[in-house]
Amino acid sequence: MARKGKVNTLPQPQGKHQRKGKKQLENKILHSYEEESAGFDSEELEDNDEQGYSFGVNSEDDEEIDSDEAFDEEDEKRFADWSFNASKSGKSNKDHKNLNNTKEISLNEEDDSDDSVNSDKLENEGSVGSSIDENELVDLDTLLDNDQPEKNESNTASTIRPPWIGNNDHATDKENLLESDASSSNDSESELTDSADNMNESDSESEIESSDSDHDDGENSDSKLDNLRNYIVSLNQKRKKDEADAESVLSSDDNDSIEEISIKKVKYDPHETNKESEYNLIGSSEKTIDITDLLDSIPMNEQLKVSLKPLVSESSSISSKKLDAPLAKSIQDRLERQAAYEQTKNDLEKWKPIVADNRKSDQLIFPMNETARPVPSNNGLASSFEPRTESERKMHQALLDAGLENESALKKQEELALNKLSVEEVAERTRQLRFMRELMFREERKAKRVAKIKSKTYRKIRKNRKEKEMALIPKSEEDLENERIKSEEARALERMTQRHKNTSSWTRKMLERASHGEGTREAVNEQIRKGDELMQRIHGKEISEMDGEDVSEFSDSDYDTNEQVSTAFEKIRNEEEPKLKGVLGMKFMRDASNRQKALVQDEMQAFEDELAGVPNEDDTSQKGEDGVPGVLIGNNTGRRSFKPSEEAAKLSLPSRKNPFVSDSAVLKVNKPEMKEGQKKAEARKKKESPLEATEETNPWLQVPDQRTSSAKKLDKNSSKADKKNHKLKMDKVASLQELVEEPKVQPDLIFEEKAFESASEAESDVDVSVPMLKPTKGRLSIKQRELVAKAFAGDDVVAEFEKDKEDWVQEDAPKEEDHSLPGWGSWGGVGVKQRKTKPKVKKIAGLDPSKRKDSKLKHVIINEKRNKKAAKLTADSVPFPFESREQYERSLNLPMGPEWTTRASHHKAVAPRVVTKRGKVINPIKAPN
C-alpha cells in the first residue's frame, strides 16, 4: 500500500544518464516480470476457477488500515535516502516498444489495448510525480553501479515492480506465491486476489488525494483491473499448453522424454536472500526436490536414459495417485493380530511331529540323536599300526625281511609252500593243524571251567600240584640258586615278623580283626599253618600233604584243636585293658569288670581242663544246682546247658502218676516270719526236681530251674524295720540269678496215667508230651520267647485276626459319649438343694455291626470308611488302553518284579521316562527345515 499523499513512481533520471538508466531499469523490470510469469503455476489457478473459488483475502484476514500505518518506521529507515519521480509521457511509446521487444511472454498477446493502458498509467504516474523536488532524486547510474553494495541492489530490485503492481507488502506476497510450489496453489490464489484488491485501493486512494481528480482516475483503475484479468487468462492458456506438451513428452520416445527433462532448467529467482550454493538447495519447507531436478546434474547418454525410464514413469504415476485414509486403530490391531497368528501357526506346525513322537515314545534318552562314537576294531588298529618302541621296530623289520608283514603276504607264502608239497604231506599238515586247534579249544574250555570254581580247597590243592610238577622238572644251577635265595628271604622275614607266634603285634591285630573280614581270617589261618609246619619240623615230622583232603579254616587236619583253643585263650589273656572314662571308670564298675574277668578266666581254665581230660571237682561255676556239669550247645561257649545226662535222668526219674506236673524247689532267702496261712501253704508244697530226661538237648525246649521266692511282700502296713531288712536282702540277691516264678499248670490238662514199664518207655512219653514252659523274667526269658515265637510262628494267627476284626467293628459301631460335668452349671452352698442334672449324651453315628458288609464273612475285614484322598485317585472310567473293567483290574493284579516276569520285561516296566547321561550337554531340540 502507498503512503498517504504519495504515489510509488520510478526514480526520474537526469539528462542523458536519465534516458539510459531508465531504459536499463525498464528492461530489468520486464525480465523480472517474465520470470515471475513463467514461474507461476497456472494449473492450480484453473482448478480453482473451475471449482468456483474467487481470488481475494479471507474476511477474517482482511482489515482496513490507512496508508500512513502501512508505511511504518521500518520502511522509513529503508527508503530514507530514496526519491521517486514519475516518468514522462513522452517515454510511454518507448516503453511500449521495449515491452514488445521482450521475449515471447507478454501480458496479453491478443489485445493491443495494453499499450494504451500502460502509456496512460505512466502518464498519470508522471503527472503525480511532477510535484516532487528533482533535487531529491537519485541518479540510476549511481543506483545501478557495479560498485554499489549488494544490499542496495537487492533493495532496488525488490522495490521496483511492474506498472500494475503497487509497492506494498501484499505485492511481495504475490511474488513469493509465484515462486512457490503447485501444492500451495489455494493460498497463492487468495493472496493474489488480495494483492490485486489492495493495489486497486491504493491506486484509487492515490488518485483521490492527487491534485488531478478528473475522469482519467476511473479509466486508470479500470485499465488496471483489465490488465489483471488479461494476465489471469493468459496464465490459464499457458497452463493448457504446458499440459499438452507434458502429454506429448510422456507419449513420445524414451530418448526424447529424457532430453526434455534434462533441458528443463532451474530458473533464477532474483528475490533469493541466500547465496547460491550446494548447501542451500532448498530455500523453504515448501520447496521439494524432484527426480527431474536430480537428473539435470547427470550427463545423459543412451544407456542411462533407458535405465532411468521406469523411474520417470513411476514418479509420474505416484505423483498422480492420492493416498487413502488410514484405517481405524481397532481394525489395524485386528489385522496385525491375524498376521501374527498366521506366522505363529506356521512356526508351530514344524514342531508338531516332534512333539507327537516324544509323547508316544515310552522312554526319552538325552542327548537325542547322538552320533555313536566310532569303536576301533582289530582290523582298523592293525591297518593303522605303526611301530613306536625299539622292540616293535625290530619285530616289524624281522617280519619285513621274512615277507610276513601282513596277513595277505603270509597266505601267499603258505600257498607257495603248499604248491611244492605232495598230496600226502598236505593231508598230514592239515591233520596236525586240526589236532592243534582241538587241543587249543579243549584248553580254553577247561580254563573257563576252572575260572568259575570258587573253592579255596581246590585252589590250594591245585597250587600244591603245580608246585610238585615244577619240582619234578630238572632245574639248572641258576634256578636252584634262585630258589635257595627265596627260601632264605622267607626265613629272614619269618624271623623278623614272627608271624608263626601269637605274641607278635601283627598276630594280635589280626586276631582282633579276624571276625571282620575274609582276608584277615585267611591271614590268621596262614599264620597258624606256618607255625604248625615249624613245630612239625622241630619234632622231626614230615609235613602232611593236603592232596585229597578238605581244608577248612579251623579244621583238625590243619592243626591241633588244643593248640587252637590255647591260641584263642592266650589272645584273650593278652588283651590290654582299655582306659575307661566316666561312669565306667568308677570303682564299683571296675570291681564288677574284675569279677567278670575272673569268671571268664575260670571258665577258660575249666574248658582247657575238660579238653585235656582233667576233672575239676572244685569248680562249681560250670555245674548246676544238682552238681550236673554244663554242656555246650552248638559249640557255642556263650550257651551252656546245665542238664543231667541221659543216664542221670533215667536214674533220678521218680515214679509217680503224673510225671509232667512238678513243683519247683523253693529257694528261701532270709525268710521272715510268715503268717499261719502262709505256713500251711508252704507245708503243702513238695520239693522235687523239675528236670526230666530228654533224648537229646533241644535249645527250643530249655527249661531252667524254676524257683519261687516266699519272702514276705511289703505293703503299706509294713513296718520300717521290714522295709529296711527287705532292701538289704535285695541288694545281696541282686548278684544272684534272677528269680523266676513257678509256671502255672492248667487244670484242664488231663494226662493219661500210664504204667512205665521201663525207662525207655518213660523217655518216649516225655519226648512226646512235655508241655511248653516259658520263663517269665530276665534276659534269658525274653530271648527264649523270641525263639519260641519264631519257631512256632503262625499258631495263633486266627485268634489275632478275630481280635483285630472285633476291634474294627467296635470302632465303627455307633457310640454314645457323656459330656456332662458334675457340678457344672449348678448352684452351691449351704441350704441349696442339689438337682439331678440330665446327662449330656452325644450320639456319634456309626455303622451297625449287623449291617456291615463283612458281618457274615469271618475271614475278611472290610474298611467302610471313605478316604477323601483316595477318592480323588479312583478311576471313574476305564483308562484308554483297556476296553473293560476286567482287563484293567487284571493289569493291576499282575505282579511286577524279576520273580514273576522275565528280566527284559521287568527292566522295561521299571524303566524311567527320561534318561540322561552324566556329563553330557543337552542342547535344545531343533525344528526341521
Curated annotation (Swiss-Prot):
GO biological process, one term: maturation of SSU-rRNA
Basic residues composition bias: residue spans: 833-843
Annotated segments matching region Disordered: 1-257, 602-729, 805-843
InterPro entries: SSU_processome_Utp14
Biased composition range(s): Acidic residues: 35-50, 59-75, 107-117, 133-144, 188-220, 605-619
Compositional bias (Polar residues): 696-711
Cellular compartments per GO CC: nucleolus; nucleus; small-subunit processome
Family: To yeast YML093w.
Compositional bias segments (type: Basic and acidic residues): 23-34, 670-681, 712-729, 805-820
Modified residues (Phosphoserine): S251, S555, S557, S758, S760, S764
Location in the cell: Nucleus, Nucleolus
Top-level taxon of the source organism: Eukaryota
PANTHER family in the record: U3 SMALL NUCLEOLAR RNA-ASSOCIATED PROTEIN 14 (PTHR14150), U3 SMALL NUCLEOLAR RNA-ASSOCIATED PROTEIN 14 HOMOLOG A (PTHR14150:SF12)
Signal sequence region: none
Transmembrane segments: none
Name the UniProt record assigns to this protein: Uncharacterized protein C57A7.06
